[in-house]
Amino acid sequence: MKNSIQVIHTGSKGNCCVIWDSQENGLLIDLGVSFPKVNKSIEYKISHICGAVVSHIHKDHAEYIPVFASNSVEVYSNANVREKYPECRLLGRRNTIGAFTVFPMSVPHDVPCEAFLVKTSDDVRILYITDTSGMKWLCKRVNYLIIECNYDTDTIIDRKYNENYTTGSKYFNHSSLETCLDYIENMDKSELKGVILWHSSSTNLNKARAKEAATRAAGIDNVVLAKSNLIMDMIDDNF
């Protein structure tokens, strides 16, 4: 699991992934998956985990904070999350968490929410964006992008027509395929090596279309849809 991004799970039932560096130090992002499941997925190497960062307070991202904290995992998040979960440490503008440096960036959602730029001990840069209607921050020298691609407008329109389907307002707080593509097209892709499409709806996204469009926008072949137990190896010129 060295030099990799490991997806534990993503979706409305829970979100969690791990960033691993070359020394097998790990950083957890979001804690919406149970401790036993995460621990099993990482082959019981919880002692290798430097800490965890949580994007926002919603259950599918934060539910298991107390359990991880009680198992000696230092958890960091914003003030809104800390108010409910006092076990959390408050994120600053720049955070050293073991072998990782984490820069949080506020993004629009229906609760305070953070995107994260993570820098590993090997100077690999991973940008994580979830649960937002749009991301204004254009970070330079991103090597790997984990970005929400929750739904696409055409699929929702088709469902409304064929199934009398009503989305409600919740989708306005998530990234559509169109929003995701707009970000990829406008970001600095000079050092981009991989993209993971995150938090995708099982019913409101044409996943084949999303992957094809994101691959075209990114200009690289290493574009995948997140799924449980997916591992994306991170390749760096220094390795």
Where in the sequence are the language-model features?
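Conserved beta-strand hairpin/beta-sheet module of binuclear metal-dependent hydrolase folds
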Residues: 1-42, 114-131, 144
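Short, polar loop motifs at secondary-structure junctions
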Residues: 33-34, 58-59, 77-84, 90-94, ...
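Catalytic phosphate/metal-binding cores of nucleic-acid and nucleotide-processing enzymes, i.e., regions
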Residues: 1, 51, 222, 231-239
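Active-site metal-binding motif and surrounding structural segment of the metallo-beta-lactamase
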Residues: 25, 34-77
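Cap/insert and terminal regions of metallo-dependent hydrolase folds
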Residues: 140-228
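Active-site environment of divalent metal-dependent phosphoester hydrolases
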Residues: 57-62, 82-84, 110-112, 135-137, ...
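Active-site regions of enzymes building and remodeling cell-envelope glycoconjugates
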Residues: 70-75, 85-104, 142-147, 221-223
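Catalytic core of the metallo-beta-lactamase
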Residues: 95-148
